[in-house]
Amino acid sequence: MRVAVAGCCHGELDKIYETLALAERRGPGPVDLLLCCGDFQAVRNEADLRCMAVPPKYRHMQTFYRYYSGEKKAPVLTLFIGGNHEASNHLQELPYGGWVAPNIYYLGLAGVVKYRGVRIGGISGIFKSHDYRKGHFECPPYNSSTIRSIYHVRNIEVYKLKQLKQPIDIFLSHDWPRSIYHYGNKKQLLKTKSFFRQEVENNTLGSPAASELLEHLKPTYWFSAHLHVKFAALMQHQAKDKGQTARATKFLALDKCLPHRDFLQILEIEHDPSAPDYLEYDIEWLTILRATDDLINVTGRLWNMPENNGLHARWDYSATEEGMKEVLEKLNHDLKVPCNFSVTAACYDPSKPQTQMQLIHRINPQTTEFCAQLGIIDINVRLQKSKEEHHVCGEYEEQDDVESNDSGEDQSEYNTDTSALSSINPDEIMLDEEEDEDSIVSAHSGMNTPSVEPSDQASEFSASFSDVRILPGSMIVSSDDTVDSTIDREGKPGGTVESGNGEDLTKVPLKRLSDEHEPEQRKKIKRRNQAIYAAVDDDDDDAA
């Protein structure tokens, strides 16, 4: 089947779907599935905008609300994970995944689903070592700390994913697995993004948690975004046992959705022709969710996952045949993901802006139904009970030094904290942190939300997106992608990209939809939303 992969979406749903439509007209057939690697920005209304970790003047409604309201419908089944610029209050309603709009499905904090027999997993957020061992304690209204910590990856999600034993076909993460740059054209990457050099040389660029998952899961494909550059790599894994076939992972990171940027790629993925063409739950993953329900922590206290160190009665939560049988019986042997989307919040109305809309910590009926079927407790229900008991959400958020559960280990598993680039990125505009702090929503006051008007010309294909490349039928990492190569005029590899039939797609001329001419030097395209993703907090790793 034909699968499209998008990098950082940044709310540009219309542009992405329009680009897909153009690619379909030029290509061999329709796209069956769209995968988005974070910064999706499922913003329904003005309150959601205030929960996105960017300065107020760079918050824009974009066009997702039209898909949420039913005014528009996604033309292709769309799956996405969360990044570090999201409507966090919206995604928090769906910790185990769910529909954010008809035909648009969020994978949750971490999740695994199946589509046409293809097993797709993902983890939302970015890595930060000081939040990694905390629970999911954040809830609206967020403060200056929780508006950022809510999208930081937690060890419980990594732990659950590491219980998987069956092969994964595709895995999504927002930030890159650490060290993946050593398996691709590193020289080309550093010529394109020279400010990565220090992190690459120190081997601190990317997420160590994602790297741990890559080593454990060994998926056929791994897609990421976050660093705003296209990069391919081929990682050959070592076989654990003699006689066992060594597996390999094809890694691809994509750019953000801007004109003349490599933000979209189409691949041919092998699938099971006899498998249903609707989204299915994954039985192994559901069994793991059920088994690990008692491990959920909704405080900010540090918490170590069970391990075989003599301190835990149980440390293996992988799915058993008996456990999977029980889950199947609970679901009446029906693994189809129900199309049970419902509107849970007021939708943005351009004619009636509501800049003082109240923030509410909602319980989503999709999550309630899912938890009832599986026999687990909604994280948000636990949070609300905790809030009632302590009169404040996230009471323990500053207690990083609290003794962790049943473990003598006080230090984080990882001694670095650089999921994203810590160098200054000249591709972005640095924003004043003091201004950023002013953006945080107070629990006791409403805040005006500037710039909530939708994007201009939302229904038209922008001329600035006219430089659309013919997309390859499949991703094959050629030898030129994993060795040093010359750089062309836009800092892109001089190597080849092959289609499924071996054709060199770099030789296909670029086709344009307007009379504009390609300049000798790359234009600086100033768009209303391109600067918002440069917001750097005091730890310098939430920039991308």
Swiss-Prot record:
It is found in: Nucleus. This is Lariat debranching enzyme. It comes from Homo sapiens (Human). The modification Phosphoserine is found at S464, S474, S478, S479, S485, S499, S514. Residues 395-463, 476-544 are annotated as: Disordered. Residues 512-522 have a biased composition (Basic and acidic residues). One of its GO terms (cellular component) is nucleus. Its EC number is 3.1.4.-. One of its GO terms (biological process) is mRNA splicing, via spliceosome. It comes from the Eukaryota. Its main location: nucleus. Its cofactor is Fe(2+); Zn(2+); Mn(2+). The keyword Methyltransferase does not apply. Active in presence of diverse metals including Fe(2+), Zn(2+), Mn(2+). Also activated by Ca(2+). Binds two metal cations in two adjacent alpha and beta metal-binding pockets. Residues 124-154 are annotated as: Lariat recognition loop. Binds 2 divalent metal cations per subunit.
